[in-house]
Amino acid sequence: MAPKKKPNKGGKEMQGKKIGGKKDASGTKTPELAMVEELKEFYHKQIQDLEDRLARYQRKWDELAVREKLFHQEFEQLANNKKEIVAFLKRTLNQKVDEITDLNDQLQSLEVAKDMEKDAFEAQLAQVRHEFQEIKDQLTTENIALGIKLSSLEEFRLQKEELTEKYLALEEQLHRQEGEYKEYVYNLEKKSVLDKDRLRKEIIQRVNLVATEFRKMATNQMWETTRRAILENNSVTLQLNKVSKHGVQLLQENEQLKGTQNKLCQQLEMLENTQEIMARKNIGHKKIILMLTEKCRQQRKGTEETEQLRLLLSQLEQNFQNVQRDNQTLRSEKDQLEAQLKEKQAEANRLQEELTKEQKIRANLKTVLIQATSMLQDIVHMQTEAEDGDFDVVFQLQRKELLQQLLVLLSSGVVLKTQPDMGSHQDKQPQGLSKESQRITQTSKEGAVSLLQQLSTITTYKPGDLGLVPRRPVRIPLKPQDLRPLSYITRMGICQNTNEIYPSGALKRFRKFTLPRPFLHRK
């Protein structure tokens, strides 16, 4: 603004001088020549003003050229940066490709390991396939759990879809904002153009008005009009300067907006390129994620199968331990049974020995019984002969003697029977028999002893008795508890003896007496 004001001040001074000079020369020169010279000076000043303005505009042009060079350098720097960014992105892309190849190699190695493990698991599965039917219910429960997991994965998919929808909405918002920005830039440019046109029209109108007023007032008030014209010219120049400044500012703003627009366009292109690259990478990553999820699912299935196999093996180990425990218990039971078997065999041997002894005793008793029957038959024959004849003392003596012999014979048989029983019971008692067997042996002993005592009380004669008069028979009471421990042969012999001693009316029965076959052949 300083160089603009200086020419105006110089113009005012020259105008003052010109007015003074004109006043001095007014008397010498004509008014027409003075007007021509003033017009020349006026136009000369205008030319100087315009030259000054041209110089200023040239300086501004130089400054704009320098700025353009700077902008060009910045543009080249941005291009270099773009190239470096592209190279960096290419390097990162190559690194990612290398990482992907490494991941593929790892995936292949994992697949090989998985195939090996799968073969091993299939072999194990073939070994225990027939046992998996028992855990069908467990597998159904696991399928239910997997269904729950699948529902959770479905929820994850829905969340992913929501995120993709949000991403699309953000993209739409970005496009909308870009459109709004373009409209805003277009409106600014339109406004600047309209402002320029309006200012141009206003300037033209003002110049026309000034020219018309100058023509009107030139004839009447030349000096005032010139002064006013100069003042208006100054004001117009000031307004033009303001307008030019405003235009320069608008141009600068326009250039800045264009630069920002170019930058934004470049950024938009870069973002679109990066978006495309990221979309491709995202697609590749999605494929990799799907592959990895599939592999992870397969690995989880493999781990679940291994867990199932481990559980099955643990169950089998528990079953094996239970079987071992059962086997140990069975072995202990077997040992106990073997010990019991040995005891039973020993007892069977002992019983066999007792049986042989009993058979021997039975044979002896049979002989004794046969002898007793023969003696009883002799007694019966003798008694029948005595009934036919008279009473004979000799017969009575013979009968008593035979009865004594029979009593001795029976008592010897009873002693032979009771002695082995007592010996056998004495042998059995240290071996720890039952209380019932001990009670039976004790009662048998007591019965045999009581029977012997009763038989021993029978005497053949008394002091002072010659046997001429028959004595009153002594009845031996037969008690069941006394006869129960005795054998069948002994009991039959006692019954025969009692019937022989007391022949009340059963002599005919004794005459027809014979041993039954089961008794003779009994073992």
Swiss-Prot record:
Keywords: Cell projection, Cilium, Coiled coil, Cytoplasm, Cytoskeleton, Differentiation, Phosphoprotein, Spermatogenesis. Residues 429-440 have a biased composition (Polar residues). GO terms for cellular component: ciliary basal body; cytoplasm. Residues 32-191, 248-274, 302-371 form a coiled coil. Signal peptide: none annotated. The modification Phosphothreonine is found at T30. InterPro entries: CFAP157 (IPR038844). Induction: Expression is activated by FOXJ1. Disruption phenotype: Mice were born at expected Mendelian ratios and appear normal but homozygous males are infertile. Spermatozoa display impaired motility due to defects in the axoneme. Sperm cells show an axonemal loop of the midpiece, supernumerary axonemes and a disrupted axonemal arrangement, as well as defective axonemes along the flagella. Residues 1-31, 419-440 are annotated as: Disordered. Transmembrane segments: none annotated. Specifically expressed in tissues containing motile cilia. GO terms for biological process: sperm axoneme assembly. It is found in: Cytoplasm, Cytoskeleton, Cilium basal body. Residues 10-26 have a biased composition (Basic and acidic residues). GO terms for molecular function: microtubule binding. Interacts with TUBB and TUBA4A. Interacts with CEP350. Specifically required during spermatogenesis for flagellum morphogenesis and sperm motility. May be required to suppress the formation of supernumerary axonemes and ensure a correct ultrastructure. Belongs to the CFAP157 family. This is Cilia- and flagella-associated protein 157. It comes from Mus musculus (Mouse). The lineage of its organism: Eukaryota, Metazoa, Chordata, Craniata, Vertebrata.
